Amino acid sequence: MSEMLEKARKYEFIQGQQIKEEERPAFHITPYVGWMNDPNGFSYYKGEYHLFYQYNPYSTHWDSMHWGHVVSKDLLHWNYVPTALAPDEDYDKFGCFSGSAIELEDGRQLLMYTSVNQEKLEDGTVRDIQTQAVAVGDGKDYEKYDKNPVLTAKDLPKGASKVDFRDPKIWKGNDGNFYCVIGSRPADGSGQILLYRSKNGFEWEFVSILAKNQNRYGKMWECPDFFELDGKYVLLTSPQDMLPEGLEFHNGNGTLCIIGELDPETHTLKEQFCQGVDYGIDYYAMQTLLAPDGRRIMIAWMQNWDTLAYRCNDSGWFAQMSLPRELSVKNGRLYQVPIRELNAMRTNKVEYNNVVIKDTRLTLDQIEGRIVDLELVIRPADKDNLYKKFELCFAENEKYHSTLCFRPDESVLKIDRKFSGSERALVHQSSCLVNGDSNELKLRVILDKFSVEVFINDGEQVMSAVILTKQEAKGISFFADGAAKLDIVKYDLL
């Protein structure tokens, strides 16, 4: 073990224990201590789910990327494992960036990651150089391959940047070979996804440019994932520098899902459908795994690079992962629902049916809390007179609240946290165009202390946001402009 890795493990062990359990979410992953961003190495190995993550144990700000590590039996209750990787080699001394994990034929676990070094140009300027490296281990301790890096600038197609070449996602193909997709930037400055192949996980060859951005969806495409699901091929990626397109794509760092067919001759993706992945404020760098029971499960960094100043300055940790989601493809669209394991945490059921709200704000007995699972069905009370607006307020007291607001005539759902307690002028609102019948809206709202995730119409769309309101703000209320009828089921999550 290197001195740098040993130092990180000792530091996190001491400092992580200073953070009380009640200061963390109940079932969302947070860093043991310090900073967290992209999920890495999301995998199932030796009877447990493993998640690694971009990690700086020494500060709640980004720097000196390590790989943190947690394991779980149920994807909801996670245990910390010592830091897996530190930037302790010449080829990765400026960071062990994002990557993935897979089990090898001999039973060892392979980690594949982006290794970052720097080079000095003739004019004296210095720039990052990104290559790909691997490490192997037993689920706790990992040793870097002595022939790293395994992919370098010589393995890039013509015109591709060696500065933006990152985030390998590895899987095993039906032909017995290992494959990986990597984000890249071509000569036009936008993004592309490269496909590589290996017989053993250590020696790689370039196969094709799987997909090209061509300056349609942002610029660089980060954190790609590629898999077959329900008879279609799905490419997930997180574009930088997005421009808005209606309510489908938002400014800044976004999410993109491309669904289509794979050409087996050219190894290129034939696009058929494109959509956002999450329509809320905080969701980036998705990664999936194939569970032993065949489910495709996705997790992401529930944060936004554009809202890093929305934070608790006295906290020993920064950022969290999303709730894992089960994926499916229906009618050319990606659907997402909370993992079914969450149902086992449900308790204290409270149910109301056919509650009519008209031009007033309503609270209901026992409908409150910050660790809850709330199911709502909203309909017009009078089919001939559509209500103008419905609001759900949560994390609410006399001073603070966040809201979900639905306007059925526009079919627009908006999440708004500007009254959540933030002292910074950041992104606090996001909207999506809800598909389907405006006469009925189904919502499943998952609250976990510092976040909200909203699943719309059985997972056709999802909105996620960090909510840092003080925990004593537990109120939940409902409002309708006009007359709306509600069915409500609330569970506490324990």
Residue ranges: model-predicted function:
Residues 9-15, 253-494:
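Beta-rich accessory regions
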